[in-house]
Regions:
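Conserved P-loop
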Residues: 86-163
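Intrinsically disordered, low-complexity and often Lys/Arg-enriched segments
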Residues: 1-8
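Conserved AAA+/SF3 P-loop NTPase catalytic/coupling segment centered on the Walker-B
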Residues: 165-169
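Short hinge/gating elements
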Residues: 24-28, 74, 103
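Alpha-helix C-capping/helix-to-loop hinge sites
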Residues: 27-31, 78, 147
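Interdomain "pre-motor" coupling segment immediately N-terminal to P-loop NTPase/helicase cores
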Residues: 14-69
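N-terminal pre-P-loop "Q-motif" helix
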Residues: 75-91
Length: 169
């Protein structure tokens, strides 16, 4: 038998998989005094939604396998090849190419920002809800060769298809 209402609420929240909701007392303390029930419920649901979104973002970022985090705000656009405009890079960062089922291949000399841009676009894609898998070209080539030799190319293909974007920097 459960003793208190608080314990019952926490148990039900656990069963319903609403972990943030279980911290209702903290959320209620922060709410406006005299708020009606629908306002309180809305605050609880918004807190639960925000926590879930944050957890999903954290999982996507971890699964992407970025070696480090970089943003376009940190990028020195003077490194770019003169034929590539900063506006074009910002357009890529909108991630519209993913919805359009287009690929991006970045080729160039070392130190020109290909990896930085790939990671920055990948981070943006993760935060927009896309699954991303980051592989540099050398690692991807090695994995494909090893999978081919082990007759497991299908496994690699499924892994790549599962993700909305493959950034090879």
């Amino acid at each position: 038998m459960i003793d208190t209402k608080e314990e019952q609420i926490k148990l039900l929240c656990k069963q319903l998989k609403l972990p943030t909701f279980a911290n209702y007392a903290d959320i209620l303390r922060q709410s406006q005094p005299g708020a009606d029930f629908s306002d309180l419920l809305l605050e609880l649901l918004m807190a639960e939604t925000a926590a879930r979104q944050e957890n999903q973002n954290r999982r996507r970022l971890k699964a992407a396998g970025f070696p480090f985090q970089k943003t376009l705000d940190e990028f020195d656009f003077s490194q770019l090849n003169p034929g590539v405009s900063p506006v074009f890079i910002q357009e890529l960062a909108s991630c519209k190419f993913i919805d359009d089922r287009k690929n991006i291949v970045m080729i160039g000399n070392p130190g020109r920002g290909k990896t930085h841009i790939s990671i920055a676009i990948g981070l943006k894609a993760c935060l927009q809800g896309y699954r991303v898998l980051f592989k540099n070209a050398g690692t991807l080539a090695t994995e494909l060769t090893e999978a081919r030799d082990a007759y497991q190319l299908g496994r690699i293909e499924r892994q790549l298809k599962k993700n909305g974007s493959v950034n090879s920097g």
